[in-house]
A protein has these predicted regions:
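Conserved donor-binding loop and adjoining core beta-sheet/short helix segment
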Residues: 38-92, 198, 206-218, 223
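Acyl-donor-binding surface of acyltransferase catalytic domains
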Residues: 1-4, 71, 81-149, 279-285
């Protein structure tokens, strides 16, 4: 278990801007890479203090990007340098992450993926299977949506974080909820982040990014009391419209394999499954 892992001689500290080139080289050329973000985001992540380095006697052995948040933390990136021990790097990362997660009273630490070089070490330290997510794809950005003028759509702002978190918590079960830190990171990283309001109150949000001509929806949440009223479709339409203006021609997203309501909604919009599901592992705190 994490709290019983033996201490190693690796130290963890935040990367500095002067180390950005080393961070990028490691992420691009290592044979053990787990990234759930675009690699070109690394310079910004370093500047924002999110990239943590695993060092041994001052030598770079690996790096990680983990969102430490309440109610859930997530491992969004982990890289091990060629020739270095996966066990030592993963152990050092988890020994750093566990106290940080406990300090914010997190429910869990999540990892999404099936990396054969990484999963056994996470399982050894107490991570357990916790469902799967499925990737869906839509090969077109054309989408018709009825406009309900009671609901307005605008870009999210920094002062919206608390209201966005409230919507997220009303839409998802506890282990899938995003907290304020996650939303702040999304606001900083996502080129597309929209909210839907009624009477000035935020009732839904959508955020995403793009990879060349393919857009990706990172999150869509509608307050539970206002679902099935076309708000999600309206937000998706607005997101697709804005992405299309930037040259995007198709869209992807992920949803829980056992969330049949969510899958039915996305399929009604023209999405279809594209690959086998990815596993979710959690360390429960």
């Amino acid at each position: 278990m994490l709290n019983r892992a033996r201490k190693q001689d690796l130290t963890i500290r935040a990367a500095t801007p002067t180390e950005t080139e080393d961070v990028e080289l490691l992420a691009r050329w290592s044979d053990r890479v787990h990234l759930r973000f675009q690699i070109n985001c690394l310079p910004q992540l370093v500047r924002d203090g999110h990239i943590m380095l695993a060092l041994q006697n001052g030598n770079l052995c690996g790096l990680t990007y983990a969102t430490v948040d309440h109610p859930n933390c997530s491992i969004r990136g982990l890289v091990v340098r060629p020739g270095r021990s996966t066990a030592l790097v993963v152990g050092a990362v988890l020994n750093y992450l566990l106290p940080a997660a406990k300090a914010v009273d997190a429910l869990s630490i999540a990892y999404i993926g099936d990396d054969p070089w990484l999963v056994p070490f996470l399982v050894e330290r107490g991570f357990l299977p916790s469902g799967q997510i499925i990737a869906l794809r839509r090969p077109s950005v054309s989408l018709t949506a009825e406009v309900d003028h009671r609901y307005q759509v605008r870009c999210a702002r920094a002062e919206d974080v608390e209201a966005i978190v409230a919507v997220d918590w009303a839409a998802f079960e506890p282990l899938w909820r995003n907290g304020a830190q996650t939303i702040r990171e999304f606001l900083a990283q996502m080129p597309y982040f929209l909210v839907s309001t009624v009477g000035g109150r935020i009732v839904a949000y959508i955020c995403g990014t793009s990879y060349g001509k393919v857009g990706h929806v990172v999150r869509l949440a509608v307050h539970k009391q206002l679902q099935r009223r076309g708000i999600g479709t309206m937000l998706m339409h607005e997101l697709l419209t804005r992405m299309a203006e930037e040259g995007v021609r198709g869209l992807t997203l992920n949803t829980q394999l056992d969330n049949y309501g969510s899958q039915a909604f996305y399929r009604s919009l023209g999405f279809y499954a594209t690959q086998k599901p990815a596993s979710v592992y959690r360390y429960m705190l």
